[in-house]
Amino acid sequence: ITGSKTFITNGQTANLICLAAKTDKDAGASGVSLIMVETDDLEGFRRGKNLSKLGLKAQDTTELFFEGVRVPKNNLLGIQEGQGFYQLMNQLPWERLLIGITALGAIDFALEETTRYVRERKAFGTRVMDFQNTRFKLAEMKTKAEVTRSFLNDGIQKLDAGILDASTASMAKWWGSQTQCEIMDECVQLHGGYGYMMEYPITRLYADARVQKIYGGTNEIMKELIARSLDV
């Protein structure tokens, strides 16, 4: 194996890596295979620097380099070469639904933190919670959270039944991550200046949210997949 990878989560610590590699450069999508690479004392393998990210500080993200790395044939994931692309595609609906679910978890925590903060914080001698704007914003965010929860529960039921389709999964990923980012922005605003300080949970939640619209397929790609399902 010769090549490099970037944006690899937990790449600094992983000792077992699922690698998508070209096993037939002339076969297009059918030339991709998934190979399990055991990195301990592996000749030709090295890790790059730990990349500096906007958010998700609790996990490392790194570059990986492979220079003539050799692995046993039985490290191939699956029964034959050339199935890697299709294996990955089969997992995408599950992954995209999961991104929506993690978005909802972050939304719930952000609303809990923000509600607690505005109950305790006073401005001009009045609880921030008692301002109409605050109450309206919280009402809007809570409603969006519950709408998201209902849709995701439907997606989970479809996943359990084996009928989760690409379009529904794309909706879950797009709507969940978009709503997450919108709500984090509103929650930061309700914290005022403290919402810009990294020691407050809401600030870290805000920073962590942004990448949700990028990984797992950008939200623009999600919209394209949803639109394709309508043009049949």
Q: Could you say what each language-model-derived stretch is?
A:
Residues 63-68, 79-82, 90-232:
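Alpha-helical interface subdomain recognition
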Residues 44, 75-81:
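Cytochrome P450 core scaffold surrounding the K-helix E-X-X-R motif
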Residues 2-49:
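A short core secondary-structure module
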Residues 16-20, 34-36, 61-68, 224:
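Conserved hydrophobic/aromatic beta-strand scaffold that supports enzyme active sites
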Residues 11, 27-29, 58-59, 164, ...:
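A generic fold-level signal
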Residues 42-70:
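Flexible, small-/acidic-enriched active-site or ligand-binding loops
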